[in-house]
């Protein structure tokens, strides 16, 4: 029997592909969709909303991990620790604004010494530098 809805006529059945794979994402679109449905954010959730939100989350995670990896490499470490995440976020203007109220456990603080606390240049040092 050719055509029709039933049976395997013509071509073999295609293997199912996840929405994450269709969108070219690593993060799970199905899980984000489930969390949106169960979170009581709205009565109805469109089909594109979880894909878009998943893409945004994946981008933010990749951006933070890239900067944290750079911070770890600057400190001659091969493993990212919370301190590296803290340094990455606080040294980036946009991420610092986005995550300004977030406390990272074991993150520490940015190294900063107020100008008034630094030692003043002595008169001898300034004279010697002017003579050269």
From Swiss-Prot:
Pfam families: Histone (PF00125), Histone_H2A_C (PF16211). The record marks 120 as: Not ubiquitinated. The modification N6-succinyllysine is found at residues 14, 22. Its main location: nucleus. Phosphorylated to form H2AS128ph (gamma-H2A) in response to DNA double-strand breaks (DSBs) generated by exogenous genotoxic agents and by stalled replication forks. Phosphorylation is dependent on the DNA damage checkpoint kinases MEC1/ATR and TEL1/ATM, spreads on either side of a detected DSB site and may mark the surrounding chromatin for recruitment of proteins required for DNA damage signaling and repair. One of its GO terms (molecular function) is protein heterodimerization activity. GO terms for biological process: chromatin organization; DNA repair; heterochromatin formation; negative regulation of transcription by RNA polymerase II. A motif ([ST]-Q motif) lies at residues 129-130. SUPFAM superfamilies: Histone-fold. The modification N5-methylglutamine is found at residue 106. Signal peptide: none annotated. Disulfide bonds: none annotated. In contrast to vertebrates and insects, its C-terminus is not monoubiquitinated. This is Histone H2A.1. The lineage of its organism: Eukaryota, Fungi, Dikarya, Ascomycota, Saccharomycotina.
């Amino acid at each position: 029997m050719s055509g029709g809805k039933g049976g395997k006529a013509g071509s073999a059945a295609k293997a199912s592909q996840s929405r994450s794979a269709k969108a070219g994402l690593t993060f799970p679109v199905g899980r984000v969709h489930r969390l949106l449905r169960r979170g009581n954010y709205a009565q109805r959730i469109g089909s594109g909303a979880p894909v878009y939100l998943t893409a945004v989350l994946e981008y933010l995670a990749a951006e933070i991990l890239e900067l944290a990896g750079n911070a770890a490499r600057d400190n001659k470490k091969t493993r990212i620790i919370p301190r590296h995440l803290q340094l990455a976020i606080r040294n980036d203007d946009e991420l610092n604004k986005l995550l300004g109220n977030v406390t990272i456990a074991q993150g520490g603080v940015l190294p900063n010494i107020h100008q008034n606390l630094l030692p003043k240049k002595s008169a001898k040092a300034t004279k010697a530098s002017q003579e050269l």
